[in-house]
Amino acid sequence: MKNFKYYFVMMVLLVFGTLPAYAADKEGDQSHKHGTWQEKRFVAAVDADGIQRAEMVGGDYFYDPNYIIVKVNIPVELKIKKSAGYVPHNLIAKAPEAGIDFNIDLKGDPQTIKFTPTKIGKYPIYCDKSLLWFKTHREKGMEGLIEVVE
């Protein structure tokens, strides 16, 4: 009987503990399904010190901007921070062949990612976080591109 009470209490806590995240998950899902997601481009200019700089915010199933254009073979500093909220997010790019390879958990304070793109092309960025059995944040629209141009 003790075990039953323990497991019952644990199940209740689990269910009610995940409801807020489930609601946030569904809300983000609906906004993406209804087409509110839109591409937001940013072209990084080369500063006087020879570095391309861009700033990005990641939040509930979005990156802003979500499409960053940089020049090949010129160092990039991408400053990113997480908007307010309790849902964890990250920023991933997996293109080591192009000098773009990072996986960073987003925080409220800005973090700087440094890389030098070495190959022209379009490279996906995304968040792979998810809660239990729900869709990943990428599947819910938290993705974008880094485009490397001449």
Residue ranges and their predicted role:
Residues V9-T18:
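Bacterial N-terminal signal peptides
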Residues M1-F8:
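Bacterial N-terminal signal peptides that target proteins for export
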Residues D29-D49, A54, D105-E150:
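Extracellular/periplasmic metallocenter environments
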Residues P65-I68, I100-D105, I113-F115:
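Beta-strand-rich interaction surfaces with strong enrichment in secreted/lumenal proteins
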Residues S83-K107, F134-E139:
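Histidine- and aromatic-enriched segments that form or immediately flank copper-ligand environments
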Residues A44-P75:
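N-terminal edge beta-strand
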Residues G58-D60, I80-A84, P117:
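Non-cytosolic beta-sheet module surface loops
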Residues A21-D25:
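Boundary at the C-terminal end of the N-terminal hydrophobic targeting segment
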